[in-house]
């Protein structure tokens, strides 16, 4: 059994690369919005006392891959690879970086689940109007978002890098990643935000997916 597990573990990076190499034409713009109103995922970075959202930086998109540059990390670049899931509303994301500064942190945020049909969004923030009735359950590096009417409750699940410091935050305060992370949980528009101490050359993985409606 141990030999089989070791063999499977060696093959895991190969299968991940295969999974992340398909569906290239389905990649979307930042921030990442799940269809059917199932939530918005926003990424940012923190360097010292400064922070910025990746959707406010220079973004070059090619298929399912994104290359992001900004003066905050000088000559470095951040790369995203996104793969939509085939059996659920969701996606897997790989985040990597090159020539990034020391003491660099990744910030991420998620919210705005309302089940509404896709509609035009006027800016890059997590839509506050869709956050009012979201309830979050956080367990380690994973979370579940509950939303919708009581008899038609829906869920969205997320898995983030182990070591993410996840907390409830105020969706009204998205001026910067640090502003959101330090905003506090007393709000009528809850979202979750997190900081992760990003090590040089480390690849990070996220997964967001939606299951069937909740049944009582």
Residue ranges and their predicted role:
Residues 2-13:
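Bacterial N-terminal signal peptides that target proteins for export
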Residues 13-21:
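Bacterial N-terminal signal peptides
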Residues 25-72, 146-170:
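An extended acidic
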Residues 39-41, 102-106, 204:
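Short beta-strand/loop motifs in extracellular/secreted proteins, especially
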Residues 61, 73, 86, 187, ...:
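Surface-exposed coil/turn segments at beta-strand junctions on protein surfaces, enriched
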Residues 68-85:
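Low-complexity, acidic Ser/Thr/Pro/Gly-rich terminal tails and inter-domain linkers that flank the onset
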């Amino acid at each position: 059994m141990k030999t089989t597990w070791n063999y499977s573990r060696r093959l895991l990076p190969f299968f991940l690369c295969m999974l992340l190499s398909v569906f290239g034409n389905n990649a979307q713009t930042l921030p990442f919005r799940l269809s059917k109103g199932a939530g918005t995922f926003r990424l940012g970075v923190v360097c010292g006392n400064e922070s910025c959202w990746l959707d406010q930086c220079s973004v070059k998109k090619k298929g399912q891959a994104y290359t992001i540059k900004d003066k905050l990390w000088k000559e470095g670049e951040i790369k995203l690879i996104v793969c939509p899931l085939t059996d659920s509303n969701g996606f897997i994301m790989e985040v990597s970086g090159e020539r990034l500064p020391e003491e660099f942190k990744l910030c991420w945020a998620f919210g705005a689940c309302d089940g509404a049909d896709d509609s035009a969004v006027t800016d890059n923030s997590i839509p506050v109007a869709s956050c009012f009735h979201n309830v979050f359950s956080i367990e380690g590096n994973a979370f579940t978002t509950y939303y919708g009417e009581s008899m038609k409750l829906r869920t969205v699940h997320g898995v983030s890098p182990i070591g993410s410091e996840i907390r409830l935050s105020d969706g009204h305060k998205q001026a910067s990643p640090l502003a959101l992370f330090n905003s506090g949980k007393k709000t009528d528009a809850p979202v979750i935000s997190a900081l992760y101490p990003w090590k040089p050359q480390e690849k990070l993985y996220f997964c967001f997916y939606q299951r069937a409606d909740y049944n009582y």
